[in-house]
């Protein structure tokens, strides 16, 4: 089964392929030249679901093929005014992951915080017929740590700062296979795969 992944991020494509490879339901995830074909998709929703739905609708309406989109972010319960659906552009619209991490480090330092509870959230939206959209949600609880000893120069998202619950290491220090068993995206993808399996 071919499903278009509503992203231009090759790293995200690789992650979805890895997450689904052990499924009994064979999926061929592909990415398309969205910017060239559709143009910039404005994610102006007020929730992860709304942003994922905007992307999924735009891609489905153009290609008329099954589409899976996701929107994800980091939430800090003690600092609800930051991050969330704006996590990927915390330091600016075109900010890099590295820039976002350093801005978060500086922000929390200014509040004299050494660690704070946190959770990653991922919402998937799947469209396979016109007007039919299903959503799947995964959450990953833990904490953000603040330290000058962190290596914030490399890594994905806020992984170099995020320590999952019941762990003593950051996500960046975990193996990819270990992360893919317990991450927020893994949980959402597993729900999606179970839906496909039950739908057969």
UniProtKB/Swiss-Prot annotation:
> What GO molecular function annotations does the UniProt record carry, in alphabetical order?
dITP diphosphatase activity; ITP diphosphatase activity; metal ion binding; nucleotide binding; ribonucleoside triphosphate phosphatase activity; XTP diphosphatase activity
Q: Which SUPFAM superfamilies match?
A: ITPase-like (SSF52972)
Domain of life according to the entry: Bacteria
Cofactor annotation remark: Binds 1 Mg(2+) ion per subunit.
Q: Where does Mg(2+) bind?
A: 42, 71
Keyword field contains Transcription regulation: no
In terms of Pfam families, this protein maps to:
Ham1p_like
Gene3D superfamilies linked to this entry: 3.90.950.10
Q: Where does substrate bind?
A: 7-12, 72, 156-159, 179, 184-185
Keywords noted in UniProt: Hydrolase, Magnesium, Metal-binding, Nucleotide metabolism, Nucleotide-binding
Any GO BP annotation:
nucleotide metabolic process
Needed cofactors, names only, are: Mg(2+)
Membrane in keyword set: no
Which reaction equation describes what this protein catalyses?
XTP + H2O = XMP + diphosphate + H(+); dITP + H2O = dIMP + diphosphate + H(+); ITP + H2O = IMP + diphosphate + H(+)
One GO cellular component, as annotated = cytosol
Location of the active site? 71 (proton acceptor)
Which EC numbers does the record give?
3.6.1.66
User: What PANTHER family does the record tag this protein with?
Assistant: INOSINE TRIPHOSPHATE PYROPHOSPHATASE, INOSINE TRIPHOSPHATE PYROPHOSPHATASE/HAM1 PROTEIN
Q: What family classification does the UniProt entry report for this protein?
A: Belongs to the HAM1 NTPase family.
Q: How does it assemble?
A: Homodimer.
Q: HAMAP family this protein is in?
A: Non_canon_purine_NTPase (MF_01405)
| Primary role | Pyrophosphatase that catalyzes the hydrolysis of nucleoside triphosphates to their monophosphate derivatives, with a high preference for the non-canonical purine nucleotides XTP (xanthosine triphosphate), dITP (deoxyinosine triphosphate) and ITP. Seems to function as a house-cleaning enzyme that removes non-canonical purine nucleotides from the nucleotide pool, thus preventing their incorporation into DNA/RNA and avoiding chromosomal lesions.
UniProt name for this protein: dITP/XTP pyrophosphatase
Q: Which organism is it from?
A: Malacoplasma penetrans (strain HF-2) (Mycoplasma penetrans)
């Amino acid at each position: 089964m071919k499903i278009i992944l509503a992203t231009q991020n090759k790293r995200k494509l690789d992650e979805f392929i890895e997450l689904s490879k052990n499924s009994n339901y064979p999926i061929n995830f592909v990415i398309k030249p969205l910017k060239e074909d559709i143009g910039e998709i404005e994610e102006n929703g007020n929730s992860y679901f709304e942003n994922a739905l905007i992307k999924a609708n735009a891609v489905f309406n153009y290609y008329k093929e099954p589409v899976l989109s996701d929107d994800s972010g980091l939430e800090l319960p003690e600092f609800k005014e930051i991050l969330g659906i704006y996590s990927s552009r915390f330091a600016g619209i075109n900010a890099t992951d590295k820039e976002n991490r350093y801005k978060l480090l500086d922000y929390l330092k200014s509040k004299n915080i050494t660690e704070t509870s946190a959770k990653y959230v991922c919402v998937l939206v799947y469209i396979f017929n016109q007007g039919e959209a299903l959503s799947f949600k995964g959450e990953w609880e833990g904490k953000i740590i603040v330290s000058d000893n962190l290596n914030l120069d490399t890594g994905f998202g806020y992984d170099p700062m995020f320590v999952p619950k019941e762990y003593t290491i950051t996500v960046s220090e975990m193996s990819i296979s270990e992360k893919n068993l317990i991450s927020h995206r893994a949980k959402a993808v597993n729900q999606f795969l179970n839906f496909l399996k039950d739908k057969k």
